Regions:
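Short internal beta-strands
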Residues: 10-16, 95-97
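Conserved small/polar residues in nucleotide/adenosyl-binding loops
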Residues: 178-185
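Short, glycine/polar-rich helix-capping loops at beta-to-alpha or helix-loop-helix junctions
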Residues: 19, 53-58, 100-105
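Glycine-rich phosphate/diphosphate-binding loop of Rossmann-like nucleotide-binding domains
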Residues: 144-158, 162
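Internal gly/pro-rich beta-alpha loop/helix module
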Residues: 68-69, 82-88, 93-130
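Short acidic low-complexity segments
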Residues: 32-41
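N-terminal beta-loop-helix "entrance" segment that forms/cooperates
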Residues: 14-30
Length: 185
C-alpha cells in the first residue's frame, strides 16, 4: 500500500496473493494486475509477486525500463537458483508440484526441459515410462506449498530407483504452518 501511495503507475504480474478481497483492495488503491510483461508501459513500477516469474518474463519486464520491486519469496528464488544450476550442469530438473500453479510455472522458466510431477504415483509412472531416466543425473525440488508427506513419498521412490539424484527439500515451513492452521479451523 505504501508503494501504491508513492507510485503513479504500478503493476503486478499476476495477482500478488491468493485473496480476492485483498487484490480488489489493492486495485482500488491503484494497482493494475496484468498477465504478461507486454502489458507494462515504459516507466511503470512493477511488483514481481511471491510466486516469482520465469527468467524470460523477468528479463522482459526489465527491458520495459520499469522500476522492478521483486517480491519473490526467498525460498522460491532459491529453487530458481537450484534448477538453473542443475541445467547448467546437465542435470535433469524434476519438480514435484502442481504444473498449473504460478510458482511451478515460474520455476520451469529458470531451467531447461523440466519434468513436473504432481505426486509419487506420477513420479513412479514417469520413471516407468522412461520420461524420467534414473540412469541420468537428476535434481529434484518441490513446490514450497507442498507437504512433507508428499516429499517423503517421492523421496522413497527416488532413493530406490535413481542412483544419481540430488533431492532438495524446498518446502516452506511458514506455508506448512499456515496450511496446518487453516486445516485445524
Amino acid at each position: 500500500e505504501e508503494m501504491l501511495a508513492a507510485e503513479q503507475n504500478c503493476y503486478s504480474l499476476g495477482e500478488l496473493i491468493h485473496n480476492d478481497d485483498v487484490v480488489r483492495h489493492l486495485q482500488s488503491e491503484g494497482l493494475t494486475v496484468v498477465d504478461g510483461p507486454e502489458q507494462i508501459p515504459p516507466g511503470a513500477s512493477v511488483i514481481i509477486r511471491s510466486h516469482g516469474v520465469s527468467r524470460a518474463e523477468f528479463e522482459a519486464v526489465q527491458r520495459t525500463g520499469a522500476t522492478v520491486y521483486d517480491a519473490t519469496c526467498p525460498k522460491v528464488k532459491r529453487i530458481h537458483e537450484i534448477v538453473a544450476e542443475a541445467s547448467a550442469e546437465g542435470r535433469q530438473p524434476v519438480i514435484i508440484g502442481a504444473a498449473d500453479h504460478p510458482e511451478v510455472r515460474a520455476i520451469c522458466g529458470w531451467c531447461e526441459a523440466p519434468i513436473v510431477v504432481n505426486d509419487a504415483a506420477e513420479l513412479a509412472a514417469r520413471i516407468a515410462d522412461g520420461t524420467i531416466d534414473c540412469a541420468k543425473p537428476l535434481t529434484v525440488v518441490i513446490q514450497t506449498t507442498q507437504t512433507q508427506e508428499k516429499l517423503l513419498e517421492c523421496q522413497k521412490i527416488i532413493k530406490k530407483q535413481c542412483t544419481n539424484a540430488k533431492l532438495f527439500d524446498t518446502i516452506c515451513g511458514a506455508c506448512l504452518l499456515y496450511t496446518s492452521d487453516a486445516a485445524d479451523e
